[in-house]
Amino acid sequence: MAKVSPQKRTTVEQTPFVVPDLTVKDLLSAIPAHCYKRSAVRSMSYVVYDLFLLYCIYKATVFADARIAPEHISFPNPHLYTFARFALWALYSFANGLVGTGLWVLAHECGHQAFSESKTINNTVGWFLHSALGVPYHSWRITHGKHHASTGHMTEDQVHVPKTRAQEVKQELYDALGDTPIGASLSVASYLLAGWWFYLIKNASGQKRYPKGTNHFAPDATMFAPHHRDQILISDVGIALWLGAVCWAVYTYGFFEVFRVYLMPYLWVNHWLVLITFLQHTDPLLPHYRAPEFTFPRGALTTLDRNTLGDCGRIMGWLGAHLTHGISETHVAHHVSSKIPHYNAWEATDALRKRLAQAGLMPLQGAPVGWAEMYRVFRACKFVEDEGDIVFYKDARGLAQTRPVFNDSSVSDSGIELDKDA
């Protein structure tokens, strides 16, 4: 909680974060052995289920749309028919956006080889599913694998990498608008709408040491090795086919029809992808490490489990978790072992939480995934310090809400953060 002293200096009481001192064996052995088993048949059943849901939601929407007419329903004003159709298709795009996010998650499991025991099946299914959702499968699979190997590492992580104090440019417009409620809201909206493609095209929020122009479509990009070249080209072919299919559909059915049937749910998928991953890896409670203090277990525990749509009530929280296959609710276990399939991740999560509690570590569970939470986190997480091997996000005033505590009970400071610019 922030306080203003009589000298008009802002202070904040910091939450202690016990820096994990567990080994990889400690984490993996906490999870029951059967949780690591992968089944192609079971995983494929979820693909079929999601595709069936997409079809059913579409057919139900078309059926309802045909009955929003004077011969079926009477409205006092003709404009209400247009409004009702708009509301119906808006609901359709939201629902199929959630289901589409579930398909995205299954393709993501293919990239982790968690879909089945067969690498050929995994990469084939993953390429088709991700290409259909506008994702360069192998390109993203490679950088995402690096993200898992170095989560929370200041110079090796691949996405949601914090700016340092020196990198946080404070222009006049930013000073005037950036940290105001309206400025933060506009930033969050643009991030959710375009953040995914800006990451793919120009490495937005990615590793800061990569050169300008780094992107996921160039075979010779910095984050790829020479032997990745053919895989990147195969990914690019998938994107070219996807763009061609969208253009053909627009030519055949018209832009409006393609927009409401495919593009709006597609934008919702991108929205959920950005919202969920941002909140998994960004919070004032989570540390970031520089090389001297980084270990894989510490990196794996630099994430939070959250409930998608949990802030909208219990039923919506269940739907959010169910339709997105628990990607947000079981994310810590996913980082401990990314080969655990989603249907086993729930049990793995329960077992892992018990082990972390035994080690005296704080529960890695955050507030539900939602716009309000992203707004809060966006304002609280502006930059980290240029120095220090364990750093936490600070807000625009330069205040951190969390401080590191080690197993020997030592702390890095008094636990009171001062606004040094006050």
Q: What spans do the regions from the language model cover?
A:
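Multipass alpha-helical transmembrane domains of eukaryotic endomembrane proteins
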Residues: P211-S235, T277-G320, H331
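Acidic (Asp/Glu-rich) catalytic motifs at the cytosolic membrane interface
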Residues: G100-K119, W140-M154, Q280-D283, E329-K339
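Alpha-helical membrane-targeting segments
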Residues: T180-G195, R306-G326
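C-terminal, well-structured subdomains that either form a transmembrane helix-short loop-helix hairpin
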Residues: L319-R355
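Non-catalytic, topology-defining segments of multipass membrane proteins
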Residues: M1-G97, S131-M264, Y343-A422
